[in-house]
Swiss-Prot record:
Native source organism of the sequence: Bacillus subtilis (strain 168)
Function (record text): An extracellular alkaline serine protease, it catalyzes the hydrolysis of proteins and peptide amides.
Superkingdom, taxonomy of origin: Bacteria
Chain ranges of the Inhibitor I9 domain: 38-103
Enzyme class: hydrolase
Misc note: Secretion of subtilisin is associated with onset of sporulation, and many mutations which block sporulation at early stages affect expression levels of subtilisin. However, subtilisin is not necessary for normal sporulation.
Classification lineage: Bacteria, Bacillati, Bacillota, Bacilli, Bacillales
Protein name: Subtilisin E
Amino acid sequence: MRSKKLWISLLFALTLIFTMAFSNMSAQAAGKSSTEKKYIVGFKQTMSAMSSAKKKDVISEKGGKVQKQFKYVNAAAATLDEKAVKELKKDPSVAYVEEDHIAHEYAQSVPYGISQIKAPALHSQGYTGSNVKVAVIDSGIDSSHPDLNVRGGASFVPSETNPYQDGSSHGTHVAGTIAALNNSIGVLGVAPSASLYAVKVLDSTGSGQYSWIINGIEWAISNNMDVINMSLGGPTGSTALKTVVDKAVSSGIVVAAAAGNEGSSGSTSTVGYPAKYPSTIAVGAVNSSNQRASFSSAGSELDVMAPGVSIQSTLPGGTYGAYNGTSMATPHVAGAAALILSKHPTWTNAQVRDRLESTATYLGNSFYYGKGLINVQAAAQ
């Protein structure tokens, strides 16, 4: 009897020890999982010849999970815990490890802007953006809208695979300002004959990972887009994002990006990314009287201004509405670039940018107005 009690006590003790150990292991595993975040791992240029499999191994060996390897950026999107981040930063083949930040649409705020930038003067000459491909890197475009001609696209939002559905309405509004058709309904776009491509990188809440945006820009490069419109941005810089934006520009694409809706903060720049990168055309917003919108971001990186207050444009479901924002100003510049290229198809993206900036109407201090309001009639001379 005494022996039996001893055996039961021993069995209970072993069970208790096992349970505590298992619980501790589970807690450690849960702790590890909870610290995992999304990152972009960049490899050194000297490692550009490294195979995709080897790059994947470098990350996997540290406990990371590779989500995507980029085409034009020597980097990969991955999920990492803190330990993996520290180990990868020490790896001799790794150049950088940066958080895969989230960008947001710069929403919101009528075609008065079309006349304000002198687009009708080009229309009357027969230049309306024909044969120019514009990638709208945004929340998708409602391709069923009767006032839009969407020629193609792709989605890089994992949970929203249809680029022709726009849950936030932002991308559809942007698309209308660029190229709403010259017909008997709705509104008129800056370049009504331009070909629109829906490149979805923002979800229905208007947010998207930087890695999704990088994928979208890579798609635009691979599919020979002439103009990229990015009415989006974030407060944090990214080596990978800058690399792919620079690649797009070196590939001959005109890249217009919204400066942001952060207003001004003394002498501190409030321009967001990717607009802050020198290779982009950073666009601020003015109203119908050419006064800077109070929300328009300011900074030395600002390049030009365009209408961005109460801009009437297309919305999903065949409807229309007015939004405010540098998001609404930027497509005026993208559309203007398409108009110029339809008149001067041999011009380089650098020439298009130079003409837009050098012919802009001076409005005031460049910190707040850049070179001024774009004048596409003058730019296309």
